[in-house]
Amino acid sequence: MTQADFKPLLKHGKVFVLDVRNKSEFEEGHIPWAKHIPLKDLAKRIHELPTNKPIITVCRKGGGRSAEAAEMIPGADWLEGGTNAYFGE
């Protein structure tokens, strides 16, 4: 999902954001309302995800860990550019 498509959905609470980075990366800064589940823990914690909203997975640059996570979750998408693009880095 592009940043342009994502930001209005986030603003209106229409998506569930899943941050799959490691703990230290998440603590450095994260997208508001994001749930943190590191990619290495996702398979055993997938039951924690909602079924009533589209899920957008996020990592630092987008397309690596977030794409891998999105493949594990039916119907999920990943955020292009990740948190770097979201925060303008």
Question: For the regions a protein language model found, what residue spans apply to each?
Answer:
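Rhodanese-like catalytic fold shared by cysteine-dependent sulfurtransferases
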Residues: M1-F16, K23-I56, R60-E89
